Amino acid sequence: MKKIFFFLTIITTINCFGQGNQRKSPHDTVSATNVSVTYGRPYKNGREIFGTLEKFDQVWRLGADEATTITFDKDVKFGDNNVKAGTYAMFAIPDENKWTIILNGVTKQWGAFSYDKNKDKDVAKIKVPVKKLDNIVEQLTISFNAAQAMVIEWDKTQVIVPLNF
């Protein structure tokens, strides 16, 4: 009887501590020809995002956790800026009508907390217009369209960043 009880205890314990269905990681890497972006993908979760959670006119890591990184496999025209192939931290300064997108040479940054001490390492900055969406995008999404422009969407906000290889 003790052996059966011991065996049932072990089975129950293993079952209790086993891994359940894990949701998709909140981190993602998206790629297109010659470019990839690695970023944390936070959820809206009923919050007001731009202007409240992510303050206007303040540097944002463009995701969650570590600073978002973008890797170019070849030289690129980032707005009007010529950028060499390589990996860069990518930040945004959201505003109601336009965003500033920043490429910075220091890739290992936690969020935007150390951006101020590294802003002298900025490689490129461009301003892009904001488009208001009709539908809510629940999870921050970065993708590439057919023209290889980078599309950033979250909540009811979309910005398109031009890239030319």
Predicted regions and their residues:
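Bacterial Sec-dependent N-terminal signal peptides
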Residues: 1-22
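Targeting-peptide/extracellular-domain and disordered-appendage signature
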Residues: 19-84, 89-165
